[in-house]
Swiss-Prot record:
Pathway: Carbohydrate biosynthesis; Calvin cycle. One of its GO terms (cellular component) is cytosol. InterPro entries: FBPase_class-2/SBPase (IPR004464). Its EC number is 3.1.3.11, 3.1.3.37. It comes from Picosynechococcus sp. (strain ATCC 27264 / PCC 7002 / PR-6). This is D-fructose 1,6-bisphosphatase class 2/sedoheptulose 1,7-bisphosphatase.
Amino acid sequence: MESTLGLEIIEVVEQAAIASAKWMGMGEKDTADQVAVEAMRERMNQIHMRGRIVIGEGERDDAPMLYIGEEVGICTREDAKAYCNPDELIEIDIAVDPCEGTNLVANGQPGSMAVLAISEKGGLFHAPDYYMKKLAAPPAAKGKVDIRKSATENIKILSECLNRSPEELVIIVMDRPRHKDLIKEIRATGARVRLISDGDVSAAICAAFAGTNIHALMGIGAAPEGVISAAAMRCLGGHFQGQLIYDPADVNTPESADWNREENIKRLKSMGVEDPDKVYEAEELASGETVLFAACGITPGTLMEGVRLFHGGARTQSLVISSQSMTARFVDTIHMWDNPQNIQL
């Protein structure tokens, strides 16, 4: 899979990032997202594969493109037999977020990127559109920290694993009212908190790389993005756990005010989630034999530069990670269109 699709998926996220970057700082988050969706879908449909969106822009009735269940790739066309040999057909599941951090793009803030994860059919967890409690940490802490433990306990373990004092640790938390007590607890240990408005996939990945000065991600975010984060962390050997959140009291958002705890439990069970309280490991959320993850910076971030547009072209920086070869490749690309001038270095 890596040898046949590795370069292709880089180009998919590059095209989505470039399209979205053209709307950076324009205050139009929906447009920045929509153009990324269109560009990602168009490039996917040029790939020799039979792909199925398992995490995308929403249910079919709510999303015209890259909706859950949509099939993409040349081998999904009606005339597929003319292009695809059934014996060589690659059937894959795909999780996408064409513009992770739409508000970041709209406001010209750092940390947004186009991301996707792929695996063979059945290799990615079909996360319901709920919230998820998440814990991401470096490979050195894998299997030692635990989402069921308190933040205080996990920071103590993390400190020991990384041979750092708590004061030398930085924990990423989404800047949400629901995290008020979590932030207070983290700070009480001496660890420092970096608040982010959006983009917890990027934050989770940063925790796996030494030198980012990010040592863990804690708190509650969207479940679909949790699967994408898990795919990346599985490839990197980092620690990731997720637990679905169904109680409105844990989320504390305007939309959760209409939630009913018992109804949410029933809905999750109807979707195949036998134990709504189950803690999922990265290897369960991304269970495929082969998992590939790709991301391209839209605005500048800790790991990657954002898209840099110049007359007649653009320069992008991407990351592709593979569980097959256990590699993380940073790809710096100059895209030259019509009569490029002043090529960006």
